[in-house]
């Protein structure tokens, strides 16, 4: 071992003094013991508080294969455990003592890095399995044993994912788990019968609490269940059949990647364990060589790069360029492409799989050797870093003492020597990574005309010198471009961008000008682009992105030229520039039904307990998806109806996630309302009104939401801080509103308007389903019934969904006097026109003026309210287009009229979308849409005149 540096010698002297103060002046520590104690505050603190652990270390020093005895050692500790509180304490103390032993052996070089990873994984598996088995017996005593239809007892199987599954867990880590049970059935032999899903859900909840909950003794592991089917919104535990259905029908590529390392905890070789393995294997490894995965892997590469930029991970040895994540990624590339045909590539552990990659000739021997050496180097460094304070971090320290600890632990004389070796390893990884999934975009700088654009940027050209580059523009347009360039240079000079930033900008601008100058709209495009660049010019990373990825620059120019809204959005939130890297997804947004899955994957990178990061990530996801939708709109890939569909499904996915987050927060604080033990779902639903309810959201639409609950009055929550059940739901709704409206650096999520609830702003924020029905039957105004035409459940359990649909149908189908209805609808429209109507006669307000969109909506609402009593099927849809279709189908309105109104409606909405992209108001010249407006006026006179 190297001698201790000056900083570590000082630390060692302080430790001797501390131990003598707490354990007596005769307390003696050997030089080896001081080495370890000086390298880790965690070990030092633990041995001070538990001196008997030091005695055990001296009597029984750690050995490499002692992980095989963990289960027996822990079982001895659990013999005296009588309740869950004692269980939690025993698990936490066992973890801490064992981590001290692992850190001890690691610091003294008594175990290799691979052996250390195996010990850490074995410790986690032992704690998980022992806690599960103890709690399973306890739950069986309470509720009986879960059995299938034949009376065979059913176990809880646990899949360890990620590094835990691969036997490569780091020192201070989350654990990713998935719970499953073989078959449905009921419990037998208990005081009350439960179905198996309920039993295993409760067992899973208790297991998570036993491992995850912070107590005076700390926690065992942070448990992350988000890799399970449907993530947070899915059931905690699923049967084998449900798992198989999900992965066969809905499993995504990224879930295949996650499943590569999945391993059953407990090493079971029983029939149920083998059945689960067989169920999952076809999903993970395809029988053919799967080159289709390359594009998905390119997307993942982009995600890694974006992660580094988003979180400023320059010194991160896991996620930074050439870090641990890239080594894992390289190995998985070959597993996923060829694993179905090459059994040697189906292993969970990285190094043996990497060795197999080399033996199959898929990487050069020197590449495999370099990658293996880099992996072991980085994993040892990661573990030493985390062992300092038992903290989950992969960021190199700024603190001089911690730097000295790592240099000594890695066998280097000083910090700079360690950094030199680290840089060598990470560059070797990055070279293989880039070679494997490269981006071969041509370099604009190779264009023979490049020097002209270089001069345009660097030199103060005259208008006549610009003419050869822009022969299609007139003199005024050229003068405008030269002014824009000069003003941009002047503004940049006032910013502090440093020599590196200046160099990158000087590379970027000729490339940008080479693409902008040939455009017909060059002056406008250049103005928008320079305004955007000015907002990011001090953030060199983004300038480098545009230099490195020619395609990204091209897409940026195209989108900014087409839409000032997009340009301004990119200026405000430069993170969105990352979206330009993937043209395949930029102009083709995800399938409307895939937003939930995409959002779930996006949020997996964010710690569940970090609210600030989750709020930020939600906003970033929304902005990125809206950019894609706008790009599809601009390119013509998405017609207006599809634009609104995408914006609506995006909002619904976000509503799901926000309600889930609010629910998790409330349950952690108060527990769940007790009546949920007797019913499916959560007793809570969100109704979408207006544009959300009608699948007609625009780019800047707010959300009209109403909350309803199903909870008997006497119910309380089951947490330590128990509150009234209905109070729980009120706070849940308030929490939802808060999560939507909180302003982060990425702005708010959506403006939410809850004033359409019963009694409006004066009413309760959340209503019981009975109160909602009573209000609609007895107190609601006609305009509130009009609003109900465009209402639907956008989030909620099936029972409330069904109840709301019944209420809505009954209200809309009430017999109404047509003359009275006409008068009330006309009066409401007149009020709106007086309040919101356009006062400029030379302009036409597409939405609010006579013959516009609101008139069309009122005609649709009048027809539903007036004729649904005779034809209840008119209540089926909440969007205007399909309402007019129903009117024609059921002979309420002539087909030609319905088609004409639909055409007018879609055409005007299309114009509003495009005006929004141009950041224009919804007012246009009074002569436009003359035919459409005439049709709307005629229909208004016919039905409501």
UniProtKB/Swiss-Prot annotation:
Stretches the record annotates as Adenylyl transferase: 450-945
Q: Which residues form a coiled coil?
A: none
Q: Name one Pfam family in it.
A: GlnD_UR_UTase
From the UniProt entry, list the residue stretches annotated as the region Adenylyl removase: 1-441
The UniProt entry, under SUPFAM superfamilies, shows:
Nucleotidyltransferase, Nucleotidyltransferase substrate binding subunit/domain
Protein function: Involved in the regulation of glutamine synthetase GlnA, a key enzyme in the process to assimilate ammonia. When cellular nitrogen levels are high, the C-terminal adenylyl transferase (AT) inactivates GlnA by covalent transfer of an adenylyl group from ATP to specific tyrosine residue of GlnA, thus reducing its activity. Conversely, when nitrogen levels are low, the N-terminal adenylyl removase (AR) activates GlnA by removing the adenylyl group by phosphorolysis, increasing its activity.
Record-given protein name: Bifunctional glutamine synthetase adenylyltransferase/adenylyl-removing enzyme
Organism for this UniProt entry: Serratia proteamaculans (strain 568)
Q: Which gene encodes it?
A: glnE
């Amino acid at each position: 071992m190297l001698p201790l540096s000056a900083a570590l010698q000082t630390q060692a002297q302080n430790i001797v003094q501390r131990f003598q103060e707490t354990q007596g002046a005769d307390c003696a520590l050997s030089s080896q013991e001081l080495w370890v104690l000086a390298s880790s505050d965690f070990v030092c603190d633990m041995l001070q508080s538990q001196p008997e652990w030091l005695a055990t270390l001296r009597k029984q020093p750690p050995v490499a294969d002692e992980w095989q005895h963990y289960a027996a050692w822990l079982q001895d500790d659990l013999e005296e455990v009588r309740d869950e509180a004692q269980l939690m304490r025993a698990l936490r103390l066992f973890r801490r003592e064992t981590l001290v032993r692992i850190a001890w052996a690691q610091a003294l070089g008594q175990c290799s890095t691979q052996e250390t990873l195996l010990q850490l994984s074995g410790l986690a598996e032992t704690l998980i399995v022992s806690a599960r088995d103890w709690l399973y017996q306890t739950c069986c005593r309470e509720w009986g044993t879960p059995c299938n239809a034949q009376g065979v007892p059913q176990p809880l199987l646990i899949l360890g994912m990620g590094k835990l599954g691969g036997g490569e867990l780091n020192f201070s880590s989350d654990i990713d788990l998935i719970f499953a049970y073989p078959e449905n059935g009921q419990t037998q032999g208990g005081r009350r019968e439960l179905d198996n899903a309920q039993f295993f859900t409760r067992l899973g909840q208790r297991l998570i609490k036993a491992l995850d909950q912070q107590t005076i003794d700390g926690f065992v592991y942070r448990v992350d269940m988000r890799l399970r089917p449907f993530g947070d919104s899915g059931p905690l535990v699923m049967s084998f059949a449900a798992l198989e259905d999900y992965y066969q029908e809905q499993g995504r590529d990224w879930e295949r990647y996650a499943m590569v390392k999945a391993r059953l905890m407990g090493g079971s070789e029983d029939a149920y364990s083998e059945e689960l393995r067989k169920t999952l294997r076809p999903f993970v490894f395809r029988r053919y060589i799967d080159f289709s995965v390359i594009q998905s892997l390119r997307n993942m590469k982009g995600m890694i790069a974006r992660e580094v930029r988003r979180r400023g991970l320059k010194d991160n040895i896991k996620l930074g360029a050439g870090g641990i994540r890239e080594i894992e990624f390289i190995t998985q590339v070959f597993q996923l492409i060829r694993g179905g045909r090459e059994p040697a590539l189906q292993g969970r552990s990285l190094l043996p799989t990497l060795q197999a990659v080399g033996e199959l000739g898929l990487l050069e021997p020197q590449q495999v050797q370099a990658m293996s050496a880099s992996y072991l180097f980085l994993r040892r460094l990661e573990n030493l870093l985390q062992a300092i304070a038992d903290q989950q971090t992969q960021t190199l320290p700024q603190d001089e003492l911690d730097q000295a600890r790592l240099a000594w632990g890695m066998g280097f004389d000083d910090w700079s020597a360690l950094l030199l070796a680290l840089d060598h390893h990470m560059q070797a990884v990055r070279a293989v990574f880039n070679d494997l999934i490269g981006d071969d975009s041509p370099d604009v700088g190779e264009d023979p005309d490049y020097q002209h654009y270089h001069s345009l940027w660097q030199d103060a050209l005259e208008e006549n010198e610009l003419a050869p580059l822009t022969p299609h523009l007139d003199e005024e347009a050229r003068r405008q471009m030269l002014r824009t360039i000069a003003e941009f240079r002047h503004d940049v000079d006032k910013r502090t961008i440093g020599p590196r930033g200046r160099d990158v900008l000087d590379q970027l601008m000729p490339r940008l000008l080479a693409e902008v100058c040939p455009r017909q709209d060059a002056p406008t495009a250049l103005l928008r682009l320079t305004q955007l660049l000015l907002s990011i010019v001090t953030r060199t990373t983004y300038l480098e992105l545009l230099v490195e990825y020619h395609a990204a620059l091209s897409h940026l120019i195209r989108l900014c030229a087409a839409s000032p809204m997009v340009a301004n959005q990119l200026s405000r939130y430069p993170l969105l520039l990352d979206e330009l890297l993937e043209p395949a997804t930029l102009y083709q947004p995800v399938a409307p039904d895939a937003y939930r899955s995409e959002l779930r994957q996006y949020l997996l990178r964010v710690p569940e307990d970090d609210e600030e990061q989750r709020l930020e990530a939600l906003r970033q996801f929304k902005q990125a998806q809206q950019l894609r939708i706008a790009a599809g709109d601009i390119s013509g890939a998405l017609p207006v109806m599809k634009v609104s569909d995408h914006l609506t499904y995006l909002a619904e996915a976000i509503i799901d996630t926000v309600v889930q987050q609010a629910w998790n927060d409330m349950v952690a604080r108060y527990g769940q309302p007790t009546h949920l033990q007797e019913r499916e779902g959560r007793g809570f639903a969100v109704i979408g009104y207006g544009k959300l309810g009608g699948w007609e959201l625009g780019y800047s639409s707010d959300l009209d939401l109403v909350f309803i609950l199903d909870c008997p009055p006497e119910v309380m929550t089951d947490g330590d801080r128990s509150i009234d059940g209905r109070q729980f739901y009120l706070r849940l709704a308030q929490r939802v509103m808060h999560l939507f409206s909180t302003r982060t650096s990425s702005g708010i999520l959506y403006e939410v308007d809850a004033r359409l609830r019963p009694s409006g702003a004066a009413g309760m924020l959340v209503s019981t389903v009975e109160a909602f029905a009573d209000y609609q039957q007895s107190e609601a105004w006609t305009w509130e019934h009009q609003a109900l035409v465009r209402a639907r459940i956008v989030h909620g359990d099936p029972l409330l969904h069904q109840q709301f649909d019944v209420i809505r149908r009954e209200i809309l189908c009430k017999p109404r006097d047509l003359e009275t209805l006409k008068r009330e609808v006309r009066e409401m429209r007149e009020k709106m026109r007086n309040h919101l109507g356009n006062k400029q006669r030379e302009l036409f307000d597409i939405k609010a003026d006579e013959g516009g969109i609101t008139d069309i909506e009122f005609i649709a609402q009048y027809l539903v309210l007036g004729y649904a009593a005779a034809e209840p099927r008119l209540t089926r849809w909440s969007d205007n287009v399909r309402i007019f279709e129903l009117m024609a189908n059921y002979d309420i309105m002539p087909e030609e009229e319905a088609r004409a109104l639909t055409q007018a409606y879609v055409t005007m909405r299309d114009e509003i979308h495009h005006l929004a992209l141009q950041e224009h108001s919804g007012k246009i010249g009074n002569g436009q849409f003359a035919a459409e407006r005439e049709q709307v006026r005629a229909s208004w006179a016919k039905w409501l005149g």
